[in-house]
């Protein structure tokens, strides 16, 4: 029952889109075009897998990324270098099971070697 964090694969994007759009009001909805843009441009786009099933995903961008989020722009105006977590989504049936904790540990390990600041909304 271990959690595996790994890079997303192209054939999983439909499942990621469904996870995102079923996550509730705290997560902005995505369409397929925007999700594919994330896939092509995000510096960090990883999924969590538990028991062979998709359990969630996290998308992040470095400060030099061409990302169109107003929240990202706010950080860009204030910090010269940072890594921005755009969204983290955990499948409802996997919440409370350590998936979010595993994601934050992984993204922190990734970002701390590359950026002086880790940011999110």
Residue ranges of each PLM-predicted region?
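Hydrophobic adenine-recognition pocket in adenosine-nucleotide-binding enzymes
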Residues: 8, 88-93
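Conserved acetyl-CoA-binding loop-helix of GNAT-fold acetyltransferases
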Residues: 90, 96-109
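Active-site rim helix/loop that mediates acceptor-substrate recognition in acyltransferases
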Residues: 25-51
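Glycine-rich phosphate/pyrophosphate-binding loop shared by adenosine-nucleotide-utilizing enzymes
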Residues: 3, 53-57, 83
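Conserved GNAT acetyl-CoA-binding A-motif
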Residues: 111-121
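Conserved acyl-donor/pantetheine-binding loop and adjacent beta-alpha core of acyl/acetyltransferases
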Residues: 59-87
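A short beta-loop-alpha structural element at the N-terminal edge
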Residues: 3-16
